[in-house]
Each structure stands twice: as C-alpha cells, then as structure tokens.
Regions:
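Histidine-acidic metal/acid-base catalytic patches
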Residues: 1-119
Length: 119
C-alpha cells in the first residue's frame, strides 16, 4: 500500500493481490480492506506457510477463503486467476490443474463471489 501511495497514480498503478504471497509475509485477511478500490487482479494459490510454492488450494495452510472474502468485501469483482508451479508428478499435470480449478471454483461459489455455474 505504501508503494501505491508513493507512486501516486491511483488510476494507473494498482495492486495484484497474490494470496499466498500475502500469507507468507504474515498479512492478515482483514488487512486487505486497506486496498479497497486499488485491486486490479487476484492470484489464488496455496503454500505451506514457509516457502513460496503455488499449490492447488487445500494443499497448504493459506486461509484462501478468508482472503477471498476480504477481497470481495472491498468491492472487487474482477479477474481471479489460479497460479500454480509445476506438479511434483508431471505426468499428472492435468489432474493438478483440475484440482486447483475445482477447489477455487468451490471456494468462490461458497462465498457467493459469482453466480454458481450450471453443470
């Protein structure tokens, strides 16, 4: 936030909320409120709380739903993307991506962040 304030271009320079990165630097979900009106994009990934890892949601300790709820509460309604590193089992990359997608979709639906999709 200090960087955004120092740059002083609120219409041009916005924040990318990378949830696992916020968690790794001990940012609490409630602190996201300070970014209201200044979020441009959101990255969803999980981690072990110690090392950056970009795991599918649910494989780590990041309180993803709490962060997404806080981001939702700022009024943000833009893009939420899934950020993954390489699967530890490359032959299962399709399953890895599907797991991340399904877990993220379930969280977004549960929080009412978007209309539920028909299946």
């Amino acid at each position: 936030l200090r960087f955004l304030d120092d740059v002083g271009l609120p219409e041009t320079v916005m924040a990318n909320c990378d949830i696992s990165h916020l968690d790794l630097v001990h940012t609490k979900p409630v602190e996201v409120a300070r970014l209201a009106g200044r979020i441009e994009h959101v990255h969803v990934s999980d981690c072990d709380g110690k090392v950056h890892g970009d795991l599918p949601p649910g494989r780590g300790v990041t309180p993803i739903a709490d962060f997404l709820a806080a981001i939702r509460d700022t009024g943000y309604d833009g893009t939420v993307s899934i950020e993954l590193e390489f699967s530890p089992q490359p032959e299962k990359i399709v399953e890895w991506v599907a797991e991340a997608h399904d877990a993220t979709e379930a969280i977004l639906d549960r929080l009412g962040c978007r209309p539920a999709r028909r299946r």
